[in-house]
């Protein structure tokens, strides 16, 4: 879908006004601006000047109703294990 908006803020609001958040794209000649916009879009993946894509060497996943977590590469493996913090203090140490 393509929407015409009045400014960058409206574009970000429109992009984030969805129960889904798998991926999106930002098209711009100013790469740094594209990175700033991408950081504000609530999706699991954002591509700058490229349509969304899936590759085995990139993490894949979304947020909200598009799912939680990541698949593929090392990040994906971590989604299927439980991490546990084990703190160790000397028996005579301060709490």
What are these regions (language model features)?
Residues 1-95:
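Conserved C-terminal structural/oligomerization subdomain of aldehyde/semialdehyde dehydrogenase
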